[in-house]
From Swiss-Prot:
Chief location category: membrane
Keyword Transmembrane helix: no
Tree of life domain: Bacteria
Protein's cellular compartments: Cell inner membrane
Homology family: Belongs to the ABC transporter superfamily. Phosphonates importer (TC 3.A.1.9.1) family.
Reaction(s) this enzyme catalyzes, per UniProt: phosphonate(out) + ATP + H2O = phosphonate(in) + ADP + phosphate + H(+)
Protein role: Part of the ABC transporter complex PhnCDE involved in phosphonates import. Responsible for energy coupling to the transport system.
Protein name: Phosphonates import ATP-binding protein PhnC
Residues in ABC transporter domain copies: 15-257
Keywords: ATP-binding, Cell inner membrane, Cell membrane, Membrane, Nucleotide-binding, Phosphonate transport, Translocase, Transport
Binding site for ATP: 48-55
Self-association state and partner proteins as the record states: The complex is composed of two ATP-binding proteins (PhnC), two transmembrane proteins (PhnE) and a solute-binding protein (PhnD).
GO MF term list: ABC-type phosphonate transporter activity; ATP binding; ATP hydrolysis activity
Amino acid sequence: MTDEPALESAALPVLCLENTSAVYAGGVVALSRFNLEVQAGEFCVILGPSGSGKSTLLRLISGLVPTSSGTVTIGGIKMAPPTRRKARQRLGMVHQDHGLIDRLSVLDNVMAGCAGSLPFWRLMLRMYPRPVVDAACQLLDEVGLTEAQANRRARELSGGQRQRVGIARALMGTPLLILADEPVASLDPQTSRIILALLRRAAKDRGIAVLCSLHQMDLAREFADRIVVMRNGRPVFNDCPAELSGFLERSAIPPKRSGAA
């Protein structure tokens, strides 16, 4: 576990994209001159149809997709050589497929979230310092998992429980920013609300910026501080949930309910 990272300046947004583009082989434009800022403590939701660029956007922010132009900064640190590693240390990820190691215990999966701050031999032998174990147990308690569940293998948990573990693991590295890529895509509406409430609470209680992609418009309205709607690799709406209805009426995009596929 690392010390809480600090912004280089209190005035800076946690996440900043400036005129950022991503072009794939063959000239396919995945993102085009994308501008976005997310502040500390803000829960921002990305909406858009399949192929609009939501996943590409999150992969670009995390450094997995290179920028063709423009910049991505996390806490004032550029997600580009030579500072990419430092920028990634300020980032936590919550994946659609949980991203857990099934054969490891729930507790071990959470402690793996601080892998970047521990010697490699400790990770290989799973010999974690006592403060790391205590912090992981505290996070599991915060996301609603018991001590008995902490000692079970990850594969024994339900989908909702596994996603709780994913959130705890993302918080383990004391990030400035959490990226959540369709974190409730395979969950029922009730469990989806529990998971999104945990992410929102992380933003508010810890001052973390959270950027979350969803396809359920009603859940975005319920939980988001701000909604960004994407179309063809560009943002076409960037405002508070209260303004979304007017945008939908003007653009004739039908809302998708949380129970829909």
